[in-house]
Amino acid sequence: MGSALDTLKEFNPKPMKGQGSKKARIIIVQENPFDYEYRKKKYMTGKAGKLLKFGLAEVGIDPDEDVYYTSIVKYPTPENRLPTPDEIKESMDYMWAEIEVIDPDIIIPTGNLSLKFLTKMTAITKVRGKLYEIEGRKFFPMIHPNTVLKQPKYQDFFIKDLEILASLLEGKTPKNVLAFTKERRYCDTFEDAIDEIKRYLELPAGSRVVIDLETVKTNPFIEKVTMKKTTLEAYPMSQQPKIVGIGLSDRSGYGCAIPLYHRENLMKGNQIGTIVKFLRKLLEREDLEFIAHNGKFDIRWLRASLDIYLDISIWDTMLIHIIDYRGERYSWSKRLAWLETDMGGYDDALDGEKPKGEDEGNYDLIPWDILKVYLADDCDVTFRLSEKYIPLVEENEEKKWLWENIMVPGYYTLLDIEMDGIHVDREWLEVLRVSYEKEISRLEDKMREFPEGVAMEREMRDKWKERVMIGNIKSANRTPEQQDKFKKYKKYDPSKGGDKINFGSTKQLGELLFERMGLETVIFTDKGAPSTNDDSLKFMGSQSDFVKVLMEFRKANHLYNNFVSKLSLMIDPDNIVHPSYNIHGTVTGRLSSNEPNAQQFPRKVNTPTLFQYNFEIKKMFNSRFGDGGVIVQFDYSQLELRILVCYYSRPYTIDLYRSGADLHKAVASDAFGVAIEEVSKDQRTASKKIQFGIVYQESARGLSEDLRAEGITMSEDECEIFIKKYFKRFPKVSKWIRDTKKHVKDISTVKTLTGATRNLPDIDSIDQSKANEAERQAVNTPIQGTGSDCTLMSLILINQWLRESGLRSRICITVHDSIVLDCPKDEVLEVAKKVKHIMENLGEYNEFYKFLGDVPILSEMEIGRNYGDAFEATIEDIEEHGVDGFIEMKEKEKLEKDMKEFTKIIEDGGSIPDYARIYWENIS
């Protein structure tokens, strides 16, 4: 029987042995030598080696005398693939012998495989930077310098790990690390808890106090959370949303943990109530400075669960870190603990206890003895971070302006919007549930009718029958082929649905689409296989009717899973849902949201024969004021394109906007060589898509595919010609893009007009695809980030005005560049006028926003009985017709339009889908 290494030896017969001093204190182990290392007969050569050796020297480690370099497998692999497990296993005896001879103080695995086979640990990015003692040997995993060059986001961790390594060799605390003697207090008794809170109550004015909560999942508004059946039976009280514990700290090195409603808390109910009263007294002290990490989460829970209002501005170390470094770096405390403190890995014990699956996020299920240690440590880490981060804001005027004018007011504005929430029509939600389940089933049945699918399922059934026959043979009497089939064909068990195609399986879809149907795509996975993702389906849409049905199925499934079935679990007893909005959610500065993800609410469709038109998701959101209220939406018009003008300041474009001309038509007229009045709907859509595509730095190929998905045929070459004509008409845009890309290559950062910085370390990546993506982000971020800050400032000003004016209207949703309000009908005109004025004239309300200059900013209004049935309107429309009159007029126009379309379908011999027939019969 041959060796697993024979194939490698065939091309490179000589093993590449380790190199370095036999008295080295460190062994650095990689999986195997790269081709270029093997050719030069030297480990850690090239850029990666230079980076490592320079870094070692910088921290005082001699890269020649102190280090021995080696690999587990001593041969390069074809195309630099990772070694196979068999190749590594066969090499391990030599590896251990090498370690015995050198006898180093520390062994450094630099990849996931070397980590696994040396230590039995996995996930090097998670365990790196920490010393582990295993069977008498010390291991210190680090990320390979080649990975750092490809993904510069790991550079900070790499530098930090080298500093820690040097300190370990010297027996000292690493430099630039916030290290303190750890002092902890776990208040497991009523007396200890009261004593600790009283100590904080006696702190002098101006003292800083960290707060942190651990909770049952993330939503404090609902009555019950979802849990696994077995867990629920064991811990029924853990289904109730509650604060299970609170942590506090008033100095670095210190942390305390107090149990509140944790299932293991033995205190009596009245004692917990007394603790809450003392906490309220502490947290509502206006002369203290409170600190938190992702504090909006804590404040939201305190308000909703304990009716404690922590309304003074708090220092949020996560937000400060985002101001200082909005980029690909991690801003969660456990990551920052590695970078800034000596407490990296403080959450390791918790990781092993975290509930999974349906119980994920339910910290009531974690034993208190483990949770309290994590909670106190979390507070300590946050206080240490605050001592480094708060001065970053206080001592920098630009960051201070961002903090005081956007971050903190935005933080509390979003909190108000979350607390108010948006009303849900439960009856319509139930209609959606029944209808979507029926439609998904219909589409699935339709896909199974295609002959290739029929044949595939027949083969699956036949394989199961063959397995049953093999099962009747005693295992000892089966041939190797039969035994192999018996194992493989287990997956075709009909009792588990194995005899039917799973249309959610990429593997089965790949077989069906590419092997059986013979479809072709230009989109591939990272492993080189043809992709079944949405972009690939769009590309293949014209090749097969099956793909069109599959796309419908995927869309219906997505909407059902994300907005129909899940949303019913997020509604509070008053039929309100409370999305959580995150300033830190995206690296460009745009808001993100969850529970539900408002940013993914589907756009309206305008074709009455489509399923989504008849069962509109957004229609479930209506006014909390019942028949006396309406939903009013204000949307910035072409905000990002207008902000682009702020960067290149071309009077012609400003005049075009001022005149009220249609920019998309004007650009289309020039690009397609037709008079502006002759520009078709498809040409305008193409113009709009391509202009926004330029902002997002989309390629001509990508734009062509996007347009094809819209039913518009424009080849890659035609899109390229359009782009060139656009830049010819707007040369300053082209120059600004070139200058921005050049600038980011010099300093690796870009800024928005509001001064927010985004770091783009991947611009220096040796992986060209990552460097190219960083270039694209360098162009997109200033525009999208500035636009997001304009919307956020509008939210701040509108929310402030509504509350100060005593009106009942409230902001209920914000999505990208739009602001949605829930208004009593008698407030609509007053609110509409003010909201529109604020959105279009930010510079009048905050002088900093005068950077918008002469560029006209426009907002457009929609109004309706619910979020889905909203109609475009002007203030003049409402003044002329009244709220009810205008909506009734638009509803009538909509019905007439739909009736004409249905009538035409019937006259042309077509048929109306079953799901639309009830609607047709009602309007006819």
Swiss-Prot record:
- Where in the numbering of this chain does the 3'-5' exonuclease domain appear? 235-386
Membrane-spanning regions, if any?
none
Q: Which reaction does it catalyse?
A: DNA(n) + a 2'-deoxyribonucleoside 5'-triphosphate = DNA(n+1) + diphosphate
EC number(s) in its UniProt entry? 2.7.7.7, 3.1.11.-
Pfam families according to UniProt:
DNA_pol_A, DNA_pol_A_exo1, UDG
- Give UniProt keywords alphabetically: DNA replication, DNA-binding, DNA-directed DNA polymerase, Exonuclease, Hydrolase, Nuclease, Nucleotidyltransferase, Transferase, Viral DNA replication
BP GO annotations: DNA-templated DNA replication; double-strand break repair; viral DNA genome replication
A GO molecular-function descriptor: 3'-5' exonuclease activity
- What the protein does? Replicates viral genomic DNA. This polymerase possesses two enzymatic activities: DNA synthesis (polymerase) and an exonucleolytic activity that degrades single-stranded DNA in the 3'-5' direction.
State the family named in the UniProt similarity comment for this chain: Belongs to the DNA polymerase type-A family.
This chain's protein is named: DNA polymerase
Which species does this protein come from? Bacillus phage SP01
